[in-house]
A protein has these predicted regions:
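Helix-coil-helix junctions within alpha-helical repeat/solenoid scaffolds
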Residues: 12-174
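Internal metal/ion-chelating core segments
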Residues: 1-17
Length: 174
């Protein structure tokens, strides 16, 4: 729902102004008020929660719903941009088994030759491994994986504002 995405952008402005209560209100009442399974709505929510938590903001139990919705999506790989966010939700939701399933599936997909699998081989698997390393507190490993891949992240799609999340992970890992 593109309306929800516009509200997500509005929340980014509030985030930059450090109005965290406002961000959470927009999350709950606007761009995640309807808990859809549509990938754009999910990626908006996942990216915002990740940004908030990395600023030390308690997001309560909001990860649970997103991890629940991400868990059955460890195999499809229709759009790597979404996969990168799903693995974030799985990590923050503590879904260790699903993370391993997704990493295994991504490794297998990287061997195939369709467009999304080429993206996975070029940057996606590295990005997923870096996200997991970061979440586990292995910041040096996350940094070492992300640094050489930083200019290839554009291949996953999304806007500059959406892909900026991965630059933030790199910066925070450093």
């Amino acid at each position: 729902n593109f309306t929800f995405h516009v509200w997500w952008h509005r929340a980014l402005f509030s985030l930059e102004k450090e109005r965290y209560d406002e961000v959470l209100t927009l999350y709950d009442t606007q761009f995640r008020a309807t808990q859809t399974e549509e990938y754009l709505d999910m990626t908006n929510a996942i990216a915002m929660l990740w940004r908030l938590e990395n600023r030390g903001i308690d997001v309560g139990n909001r990860w649970e719903e997103l991890a629940d919705l991400s868990e059955p999506r460890t195999q499809g790989h229709l759009l790597y941009f979404a996969d990168a966010h799903f693995i974030m939700a799985l990590a923050r939701g503590g879904r260790t088994e699903a993370i391993q399933e997704m990493l295994t599936s991504l490794r297998q997909a990287a061997q195939r030759d369709d467009t999304q699998c080429q993206v996975i081989a070029r940057v996606g698997l590295t990005l997923a491994e870096a996200i997991v390393s970061f979440h586990e507190g292995h910041f040096d490993a996350a940094f070492e994986r992300l640094l050489p891949a930083r200019y290839d992240v554009i291949a996953i799609g999304g806007s500059h504002a959406q892909r900026d999340l991965f630059s933030l992970v790199l910066t925070e890992a450093a």
